[in-house]
Amino acid sequence: MRIMAKIGVENSLTDVQQALKQQGHEVVTLNSEQDAQGCDCCVVTGQDSNMMGIADASIKGSVITAHGLTTDEVCQQVESRT
């Protein structure tokens, strides 16, 4: 069985949060930079290119920008990076 990832998702992306939970991932809502710690990757809206400093090296994994992507496309990005 595949180990599911811990994904940080910006709080305005509720559709992405729900889709990732349905896939079995652990989803953490990103309200501050500390929320990103321990996440395998983070999904942000991209409206603020450095949302809460998460684009910095505060996480070990990828930062996925959801701007212009569908929920399915974001989920595919998560799958390919975790």
Swiss-Prot record:
Which InterPro entries does this one have? UPF0180
Q: What Pfam family is a match for this entry?
A: UPF0180
Task: Please give the superkingdom of this protein's source.
Answer: Bacteria
Give the family, as the similarity comment puts it: Belongs to the UPF0180 family.
Official protein name in the record: UPF0180 protein BT9727_1277
Recorded source organism is Bacillus thuringiensis subsp. konkukian (strain 97-27)
